[in-house]
Structures are given as C-alpha cells and as structure tokens.
C-alpha cells in the first residue's frame, strides 16, 4: 500500500539538513464495520528519533464539526524504532443504515526535536488523510461485487459515473482508451460524480475498483 503525504507546515531553516517525517501508516483507508466495537490503525516509527503523533476524524477538510468517532490516543509521543496502535471508536450518532458514510482519518506527524547529531534541521509537520468508511451491519457483501452496476456517460470533455449501490466505489484507475482520467477518485452511494477528461481522449471506458483488501 502506498502512503501519500501532504506537506502542511515548515519551521525555521538552520542548515541544509532536513528531518524527514518517516512514520509509516499501516493502511490507506479504514472500513469501520458497524457491528464491531472499534477499528485500529498501526503507526510505526523506523527513525532513531521521536515524533509527536496527533490524530482526529473529520467529515471534510473544511468541515471541523464534531463527528461520531474519536481516536485514542489523540496525541502521543512515538519514540524511535517503536510502533503503536490508533483506535477509532464510534461514539454513536444517527448515521444512515442503508448505505456507507464517509469520514476522513487525519494523522499529523511532528518531529519531537529540531536536532540530529547536534546539527540544526528544518522541522516539517506532515499530515496524512485517509478515508474512514462506516459500513452498516446490513451491508454484508464486498463493494467490488457490485462494480458492474456502475454506469458511465461521456459529454464533451466530461465523464459522469452513476452509482446505484449502497457502497462507496473507490477507483484505482479509470481510462478512456489510452488516456487516464487522473481526477477520478470515488463515487458516493446512490449518487453520481463527474470528472474532467484528458484532451483528445477516445475509446472505451475501463475502470478498476479498490477492494477491501
């Protein structure tokens, strides 16, 4: 599984040496099954120095309202060459029971020190966002089983996909002929999504769904 990090903050530059965030997140998304008490996510620090790990769940990057999930521990120090487990707990709430719901798990890693071997360094905080999908107990099948139910429509330089299923369909790849539709990420349950087509894209539409495993 690949880890995609987004750079969110940088401190003072003292030399060319840089402390790179090396914390490994043990997953690219989380499926939270409604009939379980909690889900978990491993974090590992392969570096010899420590990081502060801050974690939380939100609905959207621009929506900081309270969600029905808490992460424990929310803030802790992860020593060098150690690992820990983040636990995600559903605190209750009126979530839909006929379809999946999408939240985002945020993990911010902050170097706990600005020095390595007495060399001043640039401290960088890294935030990783991965999908947290709440799956009601009534949904017992795998999403990929219903991938054939997706319907696609092309209009000018746009491609629209309709999803009549109760599952989030996450795309690993969408292609029109030999052209890759780079902004095709996912489509929500009982909904549709529209993506921009590459210039001169021609041919059949092909797609791949990311499975739970």
For each feature predicted by the language model, list its residue ranges.
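N-terminal signal peptide c-region/cleavage motif recognized by signal peptidases
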Residues: 16-18
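Bacterial N-terminal signal peptides that target proteins for export
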Residues: 1-8
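Surface-exposed binding patches on compact interaction domains or structured appendages
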Residues: 24, 42-88
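Terminal connector regions
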Residues: 93-145, 202-213
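Asparagine-centered strand-capping/turn motif at beta-strand->loop junctions
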Residues: 43-47, 159-165
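Intrinsically disordered, low-complexity Pro/Gly/Ser/Thr-rich segments with frequent PxxP/GP/PP motifs
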Residues: 66-95, 178-204
């Amino acid at each position: 599984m690949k880890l995609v990090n987004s750079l969110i903050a940088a401190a003072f530059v003292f030399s060319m040496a840089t402390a790179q965030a090396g914390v490994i997140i043990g997953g690219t998304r989380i499926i939270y099954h409604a009939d379980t008490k909690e889900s978990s996510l491993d974090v590992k620090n392969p570096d010899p120095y420590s990081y502060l790990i801050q974690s939380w769940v939100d609905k959207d990057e621009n929506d900081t309202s309270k969600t029905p999930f808490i992460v424990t521990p929310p803030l802790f120090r992860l020593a060098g060459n150690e690992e820990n487990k983040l636990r995600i707990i559903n605190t209750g709430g009126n979530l839909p029971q006929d379809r999946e719901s999408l939240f985002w798990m945020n993990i911010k890693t902050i170097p706990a020190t600005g020095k390595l071997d007495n060399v001043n360094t640039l401290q960088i905080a890294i935030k990783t966002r991965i999908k947290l999908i709440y799956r009601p107990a009534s949904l017992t099948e795998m999403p990929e089983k219903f991938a054939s139910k997706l319907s696609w429509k092309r209009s000018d330089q746009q491609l629209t996909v309709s999803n009549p299923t109760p599952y989030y369909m996450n795309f690993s790849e969408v292609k029109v002929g030999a052209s890759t539709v780079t902004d095709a990420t996912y489509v929500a349950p009982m909904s549709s999504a529209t993506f921009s087509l590459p210039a001169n894209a021609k041919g059949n539409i092909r797609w791949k769904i990311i499975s739970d495993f």
